[in-house]
Amino acid sequence: MIRVAYPGGAAAHSAAAAERLFPGERELVSLETFSDVVEAAVSGGVAYGVLPIENSLVGPVAETHDLLYDAELSIVAETSIPIRHHLVARAPLAESEIRVIRSHPVALEQCRKLLGRLNGVRAIAASTTADAASQVAESDTPGEAAIASERAAAIYGLQVIEHDVGDHPEAFTRFVSVATHTRIDHERDEWRTAFSFVTDHRSGALYGAIEPFARHGLDLVQLVSRPIPQSPWKYRFDAVLAGHPLEPTTRDAFAEVRTRVRDLRVLGSYPPGA
C-alpha cells in the first residue's frame, strides 16, 4: 500500500486534495508542516507528498515553490479543489463577542472584508486552517473563532457561525503530488512541465530566455519570480509550460533555452489537473 503525506490534520484542505489525487487503496499520513512532507518524500518515508502550490486569488504558495526548488523531488500530478471559508467557533458567537480569529495566513488574506469589519479583533496565523480549527476546539479562552472549512468544523466539533466569509467564494487552490521519480510517460494529449531558471540579470534577459517557447508555439501558463536568498534583489523564475519535454517541439525549445540561462531545472511533468 502506498503512503501519501500531506500537511495538517484530517480536516485540512490538503487531506481532501490527497484523497482526490489518490482515490484507490493508500495510507494517508498527516504531518505538521510543508517541510515535513518534503522531508518524508525525499527520505522515502512516504511514496508521495501533497502540497498546495497556487491559489486562484492570492497566487503562488511561496513556501511550496521554494521547498520544491531545493528538494530532489518531481511534480507528478496536480488537482484543484474549491476553497470555501467559514467562521467557526465552539459555540454560537456574535461578531461583537469575537476577540481572536485563527487561520492560515492565506485564508486570512482571502477574508479581508470580514477582518476589516471585525475592528480590533486579533488575527493569529496557524500552519493550516485545520490546525486553526483544532486550536479553537481545544481552547478555553472566550471569544476565539477560526476561519476554516465545514469539514474541519465537523471533525473538531465546532459550529459554523457564519458561512462563506471569503471575499470571493469562487476561490480554488491547486495542489501537486511530488515524488522522487520523474514521469516520462506522455500518452495523453495534454501535459504540463514545471521548471525553474535563472537569467543573467541584465536588460532583456528574461525575454530572451522565454522567447523560444513563443517561437515554437508553446504556451507558458505560469511564470513566478522568487528571490535568490544569497543574491539580494536577484531572482529565479518558476514556470509551467503546456507540453512534455520528450515531445520534439518542447525538447527543441528547452534545448535553446538552456543556452540562454545560467541554470535550468525541470521540476516535473504531469497531466493538467481537473
Region roles according to the model:
Residues 1-274:
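Domain-level signature for soluble enzymes in the chorismate/prephenate branch of the shikimate pathway
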